[in-house]
């Protein structure tokens, strides 16, 4: 099916989602499985950047990810340490892979990383022991460091560094209108969290322990401007606070400056790790 045909079939299946079971066959199953396969192979994305800089969300692709849970029963998933297993409805991305598939994929997966089927990992990515959820897209040259998590349908750009313990939020629970997006050449500091469909624009740097959701105030220190849900391109952001009332200060994220050469020298990627 073409993408237009898939979209039509997925939208129809969504309206009848309560009737979909592991016994469902025909066009509905084909459309769901083909959409998940396209997401897995990177030929389809849940969100795509337009020439204007805006992100277009393919809501139907996100619906297909959810519908996939209706098509399968729980089953044993192999591959755990010491011959152990998991109990889930979603296969590992590489459950059936051999040398040829790994060679063609072109990314590096360190022991104990987990990627679920329908997530795309581009060539040149390095996955330390980390977790990438279904429907996500991780672009080339990116490092997903130890204990970092990439949530369902999240979009991670090229040459991004997600430091240890970083959390990038998903869209499936609670349901979000759009995915969390980290654009190209961003550095996300250790233990930071970006969630609820927020966007970190190209070339930005988040310091350690920065938390950004849709209700988080993002304050530009130079101008005093307050924004929500989006970090402007080339920003350096740290954790801060603003006075509230009764002598209480509340958390905010503070844009302290724009990225300069000194910042780049501290946050540039190491090509030796990506050979």
Swiss-Prot record:
Source superkingdom: Bacteria
Keywords assigned by UniProt, alphabetized: Acyltransferase, Amino-acid biosynthesis, Cytoplasm, Diaminopimelate biosynthesis, Lysine biosynthesis, Repeat, Transferase
Where in the cell?
Answer: Cytoplasm
Q: Which PROSITE patterns match?
A: HEXAPEP_TRANSFERASES
* Entry keyword annotation includes RNA-binding: no
Q: Which reaction does it catalyse?
A: (S)-2,3,4,5-tetrahydrodipicolinate + succinyl-CoA + H2O = (S)-2-succinylamino-6-oxoheptanedioate + CoA
Residues annotated as binding substrate: 108, 145
Per the record, its GO cellular-component terms are: cytoplasm
Query: Sorted alphabetically, which CDD domains does this protein's record hold?
Result: LbH_THP_succinylT
Q: Which family does it belong to?
A: Belongs to the transferase hexapeptide repeat family.
Quaternary structure and partners? Homotrimer.
- Under what name is this protein listed? 2,3,4,5-tetrahydropyridine-2,6-dicarboxylate N-succinyltransferase
């Amino acid at each position: 099916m073409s993408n237009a045909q898939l979209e039509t079939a997925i939208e129809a299946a969504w309206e009848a989602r309560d009737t979909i079971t592991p016994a469902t066959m025909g066009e509905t199953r084909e459309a769901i499985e083909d959409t998940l396969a396209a997401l897995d192979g990177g030929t389809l994305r849940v969100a795509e950047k337009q020439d204007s800089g805006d992100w277009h969300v393919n809501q139907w692709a996100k619906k297909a990810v959810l519908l996939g849970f209706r098509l399968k029963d729980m089953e044993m998933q192999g591959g755990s340490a010491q011959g152990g297993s998991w109990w889930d409805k979603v296969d590992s991305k590489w459950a059936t892979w051999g040398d040829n598939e790994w060679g063609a994929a072109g990314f590096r997966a360190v022991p104990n990383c987990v990627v679920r089927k329908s997530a795309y990992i581009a060539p040149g990515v390095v996955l330390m022991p980390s977790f990438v959820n279904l429907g996500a897209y991780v672009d080339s040259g990116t490092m997903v460091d130890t204990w970092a998590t990439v949530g369902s349908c999240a979009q991670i750009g090229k040459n991004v560094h997600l430091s240890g313990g970083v959390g990038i939020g998903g869209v499936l629970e609670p349901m979000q209108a759009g995915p969390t997006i980290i654009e190209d050449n961003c550095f996300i500091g250790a233990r930071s969290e970006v969630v609820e469909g927020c966007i970190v624009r190209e070339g930005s740097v988040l310091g350690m322990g920065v938390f950004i959701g849709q209700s988080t105030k993002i304050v530009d220190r130079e101008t005093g401007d307050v924004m929500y849900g989006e970090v402007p391109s080339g920003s350096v952001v740290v954790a801060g606070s603003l006075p509230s009332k009764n002598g209480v200060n509340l958390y905010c994220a503070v844009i302290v400056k724009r990225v300069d050469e000194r910042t780049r020298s501290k946050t540039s990627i190491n090509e030796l790790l990506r050979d």
